[in-house]
């Protein structure tokens, strides 16, 4: 097993804000309270946490409901112990594989802090409150040939928090069929079948599967929908409603500051934006601010009425981390690019509501390759970044290597001859009539285009005649950049476990380097 690195700025769709957070932190310092990867910053963030014994005891009691056997809770109960938090939506069959990478990064950072004098434990926040079922009702896996396959829960759950959605017929048979032929496919399918049982919920099954997959790591899970956590969240939610006009004004100003710095805002905010939803009758109701009132369809609520029902409120994406950290002694949050961008906006909410802010630490990202795929890439002279232009350009590149050398030499010689002849003609035309030289330039571009077009056609024909190369290209694209997405953002961890074994998370954990800001390419 070995790893190489790719700069995050070389990955598709990396925002300027995220790239600057990683590689030019001085440019984003105004939007984050602490720098990254600095022991003194973590110590300062830990020292800023004012967590009373009463609050700590209430937190431990709430955590024990779902984590009764976790030794980490005994450590968290000790004064001064801080939390390294990460979290994710409770997606089908554990969601995208980066979920696992976030958890493992949190575990490693907590250990590093503990080893360096700041006692810390990892915590995983289950985003059970979210109500966008379409974001979590599916999962992508691949088969033994790296053909992507989407598995889906075909039902609706309008306005219902996804964590409480009951499983009717989870697509375990389809998963088993897709993983068939992979060395550990049956073992992985059995594990999923045991955790995603009909009658369970999305939240419970997600947590149980992660607990089983990461059994060697002691990670307590936080379910904000549990009554004990609703009560713990209530004071901060009450404060957010009370200060809503001022908070909205601060967010609008922060968005202008981000825009002036050349960055975009992750969350759109307007004057009527509500920072909270209302949980009622098993649904998460959208609210809109209208003056001093909140509106849902034809219903109206005063701020005072919502404050009286604070335990039934649910934060929106930009307020959520603040509410989370009002309940937890969070020293750092491990997040992906979008989450790190949230913090640039949320900083103003942290400042007003908590008076402190954790370090926003980008998670480690991975592209995982098997040894055969790595050898194929070496054979064709490919890097991971070569796949980000899509399958067609990649196939053309592979195909160009299959063109008979003599034919390739002839094409290149023809191109050189034409360019030389056109150059001589252009020089004489320019002396005679410059407009004719300009007309020749246009014609030359057309000639070059036609030669390049013929070269691509020749390469495609060579690819058609070489079935193995075509198959290799399809397999590599399906593994590395499936459906034009980064591997970690599309595929679940499950097919990788089915291919490499259930000890893969331990191997990934060992490979994490906290000081590395780059995306890692890991050959297993």
Curated annotation (Swiss-Prot):
Its EC number is 6.-.-.-. Keywords: Coiled coil, Ligase. Disulfide bonds: none annotated. InterPro entries: Bacillithiol_biosynth_BshC, CC_BshC, Rossmann-like_BshC. It comes from the Bacteria. Residues 437-457 form a coiled coil. GO terms for molecular function: ligase activity. Belongs to the BshC family. This is Putative cysteine ligase BshC. It comes from Solibacter usitatus (strain Ellin6076).
